[in-house]
């Protein structure tokens, strides 16, 4: 499922924002099971913000938060979260120029203080991205804030 056009541009902020996800995955062997992706429709592999199970690779049980802009990796956070099948996880990712962070299940946010943001992201996609799709599982909820929330807020929003 996609949100595009004015339905997307009316709420998306290119300069800063925060994504919050609650989901579970039933099938663990496959990597790159993105639950939510903000991407450039014309170049989905070069401009994206992705959250989910083993996004960007990573080992079994890991969650990834990945920001790619203008064909280059801006930030990649690989959380060793110990995810098991059919168990809820909560993940948050915040972006602003030179101020990116990701938190999982109430853990201390991982941060990156450098990076130029994409100006061409134009849609949100649920359940997959260019590399693969969610094989089995549920997106319990997704929230988007059009400002960069604090690291403490990221941690609080992901506490179970």
Question: What would you call each of these model-derived segments?
Answer:
Residues 6-10, 78-80, 88-91, 129-131:
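Generic recognition of flexible, low-complexity loop/linker segments
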Residues 1-16:
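Low-complexity, glycine/proline/serine-rich flexible segments
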Residues 52-115:
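Extracellular glycan-interaction surfaces
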Residues 12-14, 84-86, 117-119:
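Surface-exposed coil/turn segments at beta-strand junctions on protein surfaces, enriched
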Residues 22-24, 39-41, 50-55, 92:
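Beta-propeller domains
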Residues 31-52, 64-69, 104, 155-158:
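Aromatic-rich beta-strand patches that line glycan-recognition/binding surfaces
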Residues 17-27, 132-160:
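Extracellular, beta-strand-rich glycan-interacting domains
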Residues 112-138:
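Flexible glycan-contacting loops in extracellular carbohydrate-active proteins
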């Amino acid at each position: 499922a996609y949100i595009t056009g004015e339905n997307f541009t009316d709420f998306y902020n290119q300069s800063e924002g925060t994504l919050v996800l609650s989901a579970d995955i039933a099938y663990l062997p496959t990597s790159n099971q993105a639950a939510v992706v903000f991407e450039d429709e014309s170049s989905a592999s070069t401009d994206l913000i992705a959250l989910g199970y083993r996004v960007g690779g990573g080992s079994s049980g890991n969650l990834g938060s990945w920001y790619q802009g203008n064909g280059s990796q801006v930030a990649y956070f690989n959380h060793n979260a110990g995810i098991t099948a059919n168990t809820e996880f909560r993940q948050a990712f915040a972006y602003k120029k030179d101020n990116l962070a990701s938190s999982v299940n109430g853990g201390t946010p991982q941060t990156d203080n450098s990076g130029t943001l994409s100006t061409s992201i134009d849609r949100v996609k649920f359940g997959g991205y260019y590399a693969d799709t969610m094989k089995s599982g549920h997106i319990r909820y997704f929230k988007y804030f059009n400002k960069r929330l604090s690291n403490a807020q990221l941690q609080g929003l992901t506490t179970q």
